[in-house]
Swiss-Prot record:
Annotated consequence of substituting residue 28 to C: In XLA; no effect on phosphorylation of GTF2I
Protein name: Tyrosine-protein kinase BTK
Activity control, per UniProt: Activated by phosphorylation. In primary B lymphocytes, is almost always non-phosphorylated and is thus catalytically inactive. Stimulation of TLR8 and TLR9 causes BTK activation. As a negative feedback mechanism to fine-tune BCR signaling, activated PRKCB down-modulates BTK function via direct phosphorylation of BTK at Ser-180, resulting in translocation of BTK back to the cytoplasmic fraction. PIN1, SH3BP5, and IBTK were also identified as BTK activity inhibitors. Interaction with CAV1 leads to dramatic down-regulation of the kinase activity of BTK. LFM-13A is a specific inhibitor of BTK.
Sites of N-acetylalanine modification: 2
Residues the entry annotates as binding dasatinib: 474-477
Protein species of origin: Homo sapiens
Superkingdom of source: Eukaryota
Enzyme Commission number(s) of this protein: 2.7.10.2
Enzyme class: transferase
């Protein structure tokens, strides 16, 4: 059994996993190890631990935070009378007896625990955050108030697993000043039995020993990276590095071969062992149609590309050959198969332990393929991905480092300009018009948004908040707004390119969905296109900070009625499912090459028709299968709409079928 890190008596609230389950409170002995948080019955008379009542795997915990105490708890949320005594003085309120609640959130919802002292609560929250810091599903937001009577008191959301309503801050368990209405009320002292456990000394923290490189993860740099601030470590493409500190954030602390240490962007490296990302022939995000186009452009016998398959976890080898007698040449796509023993093959008689070994063999032997793999084909000038911020920990940008080069346009919040950061890095600079945004709230949210990093999201680099107007600094996208791009280039698109645009947006939205982050204003006007034609989602979450009533009110002239589902139009109820609806409309915009949805109706007429069940027609460029995908986003019942994960899978299936 793993060593116990902490051991304390707390009051536990029942989790009410079933609607009929009663709400009650019981004293439990809680034990924390590196793997589990467990709670037991406790025999106070004998001072012994009783039977185990439940446990949570540490790896499943997504958040640990304080909870705002409930005001005036009703009788059903108070501790029952002691023994058979009937005096109301003996009916002790839970909040007074255990006045410091905190929550442990995991995949089944929140577990509420009440501590007798604030110091003990702080200690537990600190240790819990320490053991979960490498968990992959840590959330960005949480619910500061209790889940009671089928809803959260803080935001009235009725789904227990609903996305949080407040940005998560690292407060180590302390409530914000003034957040507890009972902050001056002293708790009752613990009983002698509890005091014996509470005063039990914690195990001493072991002295930090130097970590051997043999115990560290080794990575290889995929791109060069020049440090942007004093905390960063330089990367050289192809060099190996050891990871000293890895987290779910986009920056890792690393050590190079010379012993230098610093932070590196995690999307610039890949694991050294058996990784294929470092090879010239591998193109991770290339689609089938893009591979075919590139191979035909090269036109070389035996030209090949290894890419991610549309089937999760699979790879495909795309090969070009002229030797078949077809003057245009032909392309074959071979899925890399694997045996139960994890050996890879393209032809069953030839098994290999790694994909690089497999490719190396077929570079010398066709062995059933249309051609030997002679010539690796790759995208020219593979651009390094954007970093989450301009250096580790840098989110406040000095405006003196910015050079303004040209105006790009005017948006909801003000003028947008193209410029350079420190004369070297391309950036877009949004100059926020005073009075257009709830600035203080946005500045708090910007810290969270900077940690949202995905190749199909327009990266937020930082903000300038020391002067007015404030600036928002983002990744620069050379081809501008998707809506204008569709309208201006309308005669140059093939249907496969349109589907790839939908895939780009869906990948970004699947990522936001996994982070429980809502966009709230998804539309072609809020997507941008880079110089390689890749579409990225922009302005995610910004609509919450608009101060213009014409934009925020569902009856306002600027409200995105044409992208909104019935529950938003009628009740202003935003969720991931309202983003799904908007994505369906965005697909329609793409396939109509930038037409206005419901172009024959006014906003009020559109809202009325949507409520009556009217949906957008099939654009002539959209196949029946594509239209089925977009139509699935417009189900009247939000729960019946698919997730972005399902939508992406459906889009990839159609891409394979229609290419």
């Amino acid at each position: 059994m793993a060593a116990v890190i902490l051991e304390s008596i707390f009051l536990k609230r029942s989790q009410q996993k079933k609607k009929t389950s009663p709400l009650n409170f019981k004293k439990r002995l809680f034990l924390l190890t590196v793997h589990k948080l467990s709670y037991y019955e406790y025999d106070f008379e004998r001072g012994r631990r009783g039977s185990k009542k439940g446990s949570i795997d540490v790896e499943k915990i997504t958040c640990v935070e304080t909870v705002v105490p409930e005001k005036n708890p009703p009788p059903e949320r108070q501790i029952p009378r002691r023994g058979e005594e009937s005096s109301e003085m003996e009916q002790i309120s839970i909040i007074e007896r255990f006045p410091y609640p905190f929550q442990v959130v995991y995949d089944e919802g929140p577990l509420y625990v009440f501590s007798p002292t604030e110091e003990l609560r702080k200690r537990w929250i600190h240790q819990l955050k320490n053991v979960i810091r490498y968990n992959s599903d840590l959330v960005q937001k949480y619910h500061p108030c209790f889940w009671i009577d089928g809803q959260y008191l803080c935001c009235s959301q009725t789904a227990k697993n609903a996305m949080g309503c407040q940005i998560l801050e690292n407060r180590n368990g302390s409530l914000k000043p003034g957040s507890s209405h009972r902050k001056t009320k002293k708790p009752l002292p613990p009983t002698p039995e509890e005091d014996q456990i509470l005063k039990k000394p914690l195990p001493p923290e072991p002295a930090a020993a130097p970590v051997s490189t043999s115990e560290l993860k080794k990575v290889v740099a995929l791109y060069d990276y020049m440090p942007m601030n004093a905390n960063d470590l330089q990367l050289r493409k192809g060099d190996e590095y050891f990871i000293l500190e890895e987290s779910n954030l986009p920056w890792w602390r690393a050590r190079d071969k010379n012993g230098q240490e610093g932070y590196i962007p995690s999307n610039y490296v890949t694991e050294a062992e058996d990784s294929i990302e470092m090879y010239e022939w591998y193109s991770k995000h290339m689609t089938r149609s893009q591979a075919e186009q590139l191979l035909k452009q090269e036109g070389k016998e035996g030209g090949f590309i290894v890419r991610d398959s549309s089937k999760a976890g699979k790879y495909t080898v795309s090969v070009f050959a002229k030797s078949t007698g077809d003057p245009q040449g032909v392309i074959r796509h071979y899925v890399v198969c694997s045996t139960p023993q994890s050996q890879y093959y393209l032809a069953e008689k030839h098994l290999f332990s790694t994909i690089p070994e497999l490719i190396n063999y077929h570079q010398h032997n066709s062995a059933g393929l249309i051609s030997r793999l002679k010539y690796p084909v790759s995208q020219q000038n593979k651009n390094a991905p954007s970093t989450a911020g301009l250096g580790y920990g840098s989110w406040e940008i000095d405006p003196k480092d910015l050079t303004f080069l040209k105006e790009l346009g005017t948006g909801q919040f003000g003028v947008v300009k193209y410029g350079k950061w420190r004369g070297q890095y391309d950036v877009a600079i949004k100059m926020i018009k005073e009075g257009s945004m709830s600035e203080d709230e946005f500045i708090e949210e910007a810290k969270v948004m900077m940690n949202l990093s995905h190749e199909k999201l327009v990266q937020l680099y930082g903000v300038c908040t020391k002067q007015r107007p404030i600036f928002i600094i983002t990744e620069y996208m050379a081809n501008g707004c998707l809506l204008n791009y569709l309208r201006e280039m309308r005669h140059r698109f093939q249907t496969q390119q349109l589907l790839e645009m939908c895939k780009d947006v869906c990948e970004a939205m699947e990522y936001l969905e996994s982070k429980q982050f809502l966009h709230r204003d998804l539309a072609a006007r809020n997507c941008l296109v880079n110089d390689q034609g890749v579409v990225k989602v922009s302005d995610f979450g910004l609509s919450r900070y608009v101060l213009d009533d014409e934009y925020t009110s569902s009856v306002g002239s600027k409200f995105p009625v044409r992208w909104s589902p019935p529950e938003v139009l009628m009740y202003s109820k935003f969720s991931s499912k309202s983003d799904i609806w908007a994505f369906g409309v965005l697909m329609w915009e793409i396939y109509s090459l930038g037409k206005m949805p419901y172009e024959r109706f006014t906003n009020s007429e559109t809202a009325e028709h949507i409520a009556q069940g009217l949906r957008l027609y099939r654009p002539h460029l959209a196949s029946e299968k594509v239209y089925t995908i977009m139509y699935s986003c417009w189900h009247e019942k939000a729960d019946e709409r698919p997730t972005f994960k399902i939508l992406l899978s459906n889009i990839l299936d159609v891409m394979d079928e229609e290419s």
